[in-house]
């Protein structure tokens, strides 16, 4: 029997702002409570640090008001597979506006924590490789999904024929451009397959997981733009409805 080596990797470094729709609301609340308007980008233009505080306050209130209206609109429309083209266009337009609004508010922090994340994942990557090289089986006990980058890439570095099964209601297949919130823990599977080509995998020179060898099991809450990434890559998704319909055993057979 192969020895199991347990790797403790508890972290929440991938978190940027909390949750999907909640993330946008958090940014709004942060903006409302902020007295330093030059921390933000308003209407696409950086505010001068020495600009008039009264003018800044008016700009902030105006922007927040529009942003609040946008959030209210978002709660009135939800993406459904049976939407007609007009309804889908309306949803995508609102989602696009929300993405722009969030990134405008938080543009200076778009890739926050990258240095710490990369340092952590590189250590985890090397540890995973060492465990496998020693003939042991790595069992990772980790924090948020960002730890999957170091462990999965370390594994495929030692076994180039590996596939990856992602048990999650989320696909974690976002990219920087498609992520609404900027939560980096929504990118790991895209990084592991090199769909998201970013510095999150700079410590690894390949190989990456083949799209055809990547399977998502339990998907039920996938962003519309993220769905576009999944479909573009050709990654297989078994939804919660598929599990109910076919059963866990059959889904596992199909996944393998």
Name the predicted role of every residue range.
Residues 2-6, 12-256:
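Conserved alpha-helical scaffold segments that buttress catalytic/binding sites
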């Amino acid at each position: 029997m192969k020895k199991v080596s347990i790797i403790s990797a508890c972290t929440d470094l991938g978190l940027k702002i909390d949750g999907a729709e909640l993330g946008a609301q958090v940014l709004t609340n942060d903006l409302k409570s902020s007295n330093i308007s030059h921390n933000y980008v308003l209407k696409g233009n950086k505010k001068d640090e020495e600009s008039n505080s009264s003018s800044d306050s008016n700009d902030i209130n105006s922007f927040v008001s529009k942003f609040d209206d946008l959030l209210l609109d978002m709660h009135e429309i939800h993406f459904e597979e049976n939407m007609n083209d007009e309804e889908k266009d309306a949803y995508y337009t609102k989602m696009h506006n929300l993405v722009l609004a969030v990134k405008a508010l938080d543009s200076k922090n778009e890739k926050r924590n990258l240095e710490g994340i990369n340092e952590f994942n590189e250590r985890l990557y090397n540890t995973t490789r060492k465990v496998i090289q020693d003939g042991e089986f790595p069992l990772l006990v980790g924090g948020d999904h960002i730890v999957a980058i170091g462990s999965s890439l370390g594994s495929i570095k030692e076994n180039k024929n590996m596939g990856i099964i992602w048990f999650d209601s989320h696909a974690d297949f976002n990219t920087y451009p498609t992520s609404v919130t900027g939560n980096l823990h929504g990118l790991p599977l895209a990084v592991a397959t090199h769909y998201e080509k970013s510095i999150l995998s700079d410590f690894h020179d390949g190989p990456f997981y083949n799209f055809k060898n990547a399977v998502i099991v339990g998907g039920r809450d996938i962003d519309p733009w993220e769905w576009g990434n999944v479909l573009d890559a050709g990654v297989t998704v078994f939804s919660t409805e598929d599990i109910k319909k076919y059963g866990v055993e059959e889904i596992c057979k199909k996944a393998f």
